[in-house]
């Protein structure tokens, strides 16, 4: 059976991956094709992400071009983008859909920073909860005489070090994302 610290590390890695995915959906000053990863289109009755239905290119810093592999999907993709409320209106020319991203206002940038700070805080809370679960698991093992008091202290220290490492990663990711958003 895996150690509680191994389980905790796996969960912490997942929390970081989730945060990275969330950050990717937050639009900074330039067009990011990942903004479309979670936009679902009805494809023969199955909700399908846009990247699986079309080629996506970024010909300019503030433009994304979506070229569906099936022409009939053009309207469906356009509808899905409008419904997703990405803060951009799709322009459909009959062959491709162009998304032109407006310059971000100072106010919008500050809103986005607030949004990513909340995402980072949620990730930190998740990391803290994982730390607590792991320590509780070790305490249970101590109570059942599976480990000694010294083992418990060592385990608590190791879990704390792991916690600190992942909290630091969150701080670095947040700092980089804030910088990206505030870049004009």
Curated annotation (Swiss-Prot):
**What's the main place this protein lives?**
cytoplasm
Protein function: Responsible for the release of ribosomes from messenger RNA at the termination of protein biosynthesis. May increase the efficiency of translation by recycling ribosomes from one round of translation to another.
**What Gene Ontology cellular-component terms does the record carry?**
cytoplasm
Protein name as catalogued: Ribosome-recycling factor
Q: Which CDD domains match?
A: RRF
Q: Does the keyword Protein biosynthesis apply?
A: yes
Q: Which Pfam families match?
A: RRF
Q: Which PANTHER family match?
A: MITOCHONDRIAL RIBOSOME RECYCLING FACTOR PSEUDO 1, RIBOSOME RECYCLING FACTOR
Q: Where in the cell is it found?
A: Cytoplasm
GO biological process, alphabetically ordered? translational termination
Q: Which UniProt keywords apply?
A: Cytoplasm, Protein biosynthesis
Q: Which family does it belong to?
A: Belongs to the RRF family.
Which lineage do the record's taxonomy fields give for this organism? Bacteria, Bacillati, Bacillota, Bacillota incertae sedis, Caldicellulosiruptorales
Q: In the UniProt record, does the keyword Cytoplasm occur?
A: yes
State one molecular function term (GO). Answer: ribosomal large subunit binding
């Amino acid at each position: 059976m895996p150690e509680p610290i191994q389980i905790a590390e796996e969960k912490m890695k997942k929390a970081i991956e989730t945060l990275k995915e969330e950050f990717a959906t937050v639009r900074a000053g330039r067009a990011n094709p990942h903004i479309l990863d979670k936009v679902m289109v009805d494809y023969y009755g199955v909700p399908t992400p846009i990247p699986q239905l079309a080629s996506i290119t970024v010909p300019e810093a503030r433009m994304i071009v979506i070229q569906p592999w099936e022409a009939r999907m053009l309207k469906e993709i356009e509808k899905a983008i409008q419904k997703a409320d990405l803060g951009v209106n799709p322009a459909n020319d009959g062959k491709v859909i162009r998304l032109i991203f407006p310059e971000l206002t100072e106010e919008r940038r500050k809103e986005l920073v607030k949004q990513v700070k909340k995402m980072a805080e949620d990730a930190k809370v998740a990391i803290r909860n994982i730390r607590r679960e792991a320590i509780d698991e070790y305490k249970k093992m101590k109570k059942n005489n599976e480990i000694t008091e010294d083992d418990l202290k060592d385990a608590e220290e190791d879990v704390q070090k792991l916690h600190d490492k992942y909290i630091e990663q969150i701080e670095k990711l947040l700092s980089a994302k804030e910088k990206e958003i505030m870049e004009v």
